[in-house]
């Protein structure tokens, strides 16, 4: 660590949307954002779980618009920057401008790990707006460290000043993480930051985040009580406790985060965010974590096991954006019974 301060990026109000089907109220957003700000996290990501304009039949309709959620959070924060997520093809540069006007100052432009080339316009426009612009390579387990580094280099070339390794399936272990950060560090400019976005499907969210920091990672994504898709993200309060034990500087208030996790976030979970049969299957099969709730719905509708659907999706190497294939797979499994 060499005494540097970690950048703590909270994702409770974006990835956490998946855990409750994108149904945060504006009051929920204000209370959680204020608690995070009081605990001195560096940024608070706010959007539909699938990013700006993710509210749709395919991904699930949100209780509010992205702009309403962003404005609600921006109204109560004094220290943290408001961040948002944009997936090219779902959100547009017009949506990004509106998010900026609503108060977002950080954007993570997210693509599948082999499709960085679709992010060029969005990254360039974000830089023109003056936003802190981050490249976000989802499902990073699905390509080699060397290929991932080449994709990261593309995003850097478009103007991203930080590139994330994103374990969307919660499928990687510490060696996988180390290999990817070493590859990125060898390819990127020294001044380009790196970030880690973990999921906890194999219970390795915190361990993988620690491994990333040990390899020089600058920014860590985490969420209160792990609130996120699948078994959730690296639980923020747990990561901070572990970072304290390691003597790392993070600038946040551990006990305030612990209180926010248990008092504000955990009570909102209509399905526990934890490692269980279904979420473990996500990590084991390497499936996009936000498929969980969609798979459980399809399993109930067609009289199937959600695990069977998840395993088949993994075999077919489905990726984020292919949520419509969940029903196809379910029908295939039912017909083959």
UniProtKB/Swiss-Prot annotation:
The active site is at residue 18. The keyword Methyltransferase does not apply. Mn(2+) binds at residues 15, 197, 199. GO terms for molecular function: 2-isopropylmalate synthase activity; 4-hydroxy-2-oxovalerate aldolase activity; manganese ion binding. Its EC number is 4.1.3.39. It is an enzyme of class 4 (lyase). The record marks 14 as: Transition state stabilizer. Residues 6-258 form the Pyruvate carboxyltransferase domain. It catalyses: (S)-4-hydroxy-2-oxopentanoate = acetaldehyde + pyruvate. Gene3D superfamilies: 1.10.8.60, Aldolase class I (3.20.20.70). GO terms for biological process: 3-phenylpropionate catabolic process; L-leucine biosynthetic process. Keywords: Aromatic hydrocarbons catabolism, Lyase, Manganese, Metal-binding. Substrate binds at residues 14-15, 168, 197, 288. Pfam families: DmpG_comm, HMGL-like. Belongs to the 4-hydroxy-2-oxovalerate aldolase family. PANTHER family: 2-ISOPROPYLMALATE SYNTHASE 1, CHLOROPLASTIC-RELATED, HOMOCITRATE SYNTHASE-RELATED. Catalyzes the retro-aldol cleavage of 4-hydroxy-2-oxopentanoate to pyruvate and acetaldehyde. Is involved in the meta-cleavage pathway for the degradation of aromatic compounds. Interacts with MhpF. This is 4-hydroxy-2-oxovalerate aldolase. The lineage of its organism: Bacteria, Pseudomonadati, Pseudomonadota, Gammaproteobacteria, Enterobacterales.
């Amino acid at each position: 660590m060499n005494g540097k301060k970690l950048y703590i990026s909270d994702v409770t109000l974006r990835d956490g949307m998946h855990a409750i089907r994108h149904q945060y109220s504006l009051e929920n957003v204000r209370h959680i954002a204020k608690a995070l700000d009081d605990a001195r996290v560096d940024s608070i990501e706010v959007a539909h779980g699938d990013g700006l304009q993710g509210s749709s039949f395919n991904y699930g309709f949100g209780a509010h618009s992205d702009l309403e959620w962003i404005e609600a959070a921006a109204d109560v924060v004094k220290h943290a920057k408001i961040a948002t997520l944009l997936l090219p093809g779902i959100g547009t540069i017009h949506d990004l401008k509106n998010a900026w006007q609503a108060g977002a100052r950080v954007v993570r432009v997210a693509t599948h790990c082999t499709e960085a080339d679709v992010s060029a316009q969005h990254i360039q426009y974000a830089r023109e707006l003056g936003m802190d612009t981050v490249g976000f390579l989802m499902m990073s387990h699905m390509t080699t460290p060397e290929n991932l580094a080449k994709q990261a280099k593309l995003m850097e070339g478009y103007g991203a000043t930080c590139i994330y390794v994103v374990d969307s399936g919660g499928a990687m272990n510490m060696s996988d993480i180390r290999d990817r950060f070493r590859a990125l560090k060898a390819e990127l400019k020294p001044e380009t930051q790196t970030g880690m976005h973990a999921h906890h499907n194999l219970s390795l969210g915190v361990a993988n985040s620690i491994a990333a920091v040990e390899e020089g990672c600058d920014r860590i994504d985490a969420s209160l009580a792990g609130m996120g898709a699948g078994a959730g993200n690296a639980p923020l309060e747990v990561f901070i406790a572990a970072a304290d034990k390691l003597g790392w500087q993070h600038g946040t208030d551990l006990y305030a985060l612990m209180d926010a996790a248990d008092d504000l976030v955990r009570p909102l979970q209509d399905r526990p965010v934890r490692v269980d049969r279904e979420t473990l299957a996500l990590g084991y099969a390497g499936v996009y974590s936000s498929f969980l709730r969609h798979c459980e719905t399809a399993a109930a509708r067609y009289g199937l096991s959600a695990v069977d659907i998840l395993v088949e999706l993994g075999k077919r190497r489905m990726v984020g954006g292919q949520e419509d294939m969940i029903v196809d797979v379910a029908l295939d499994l039912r017909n083959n019974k």
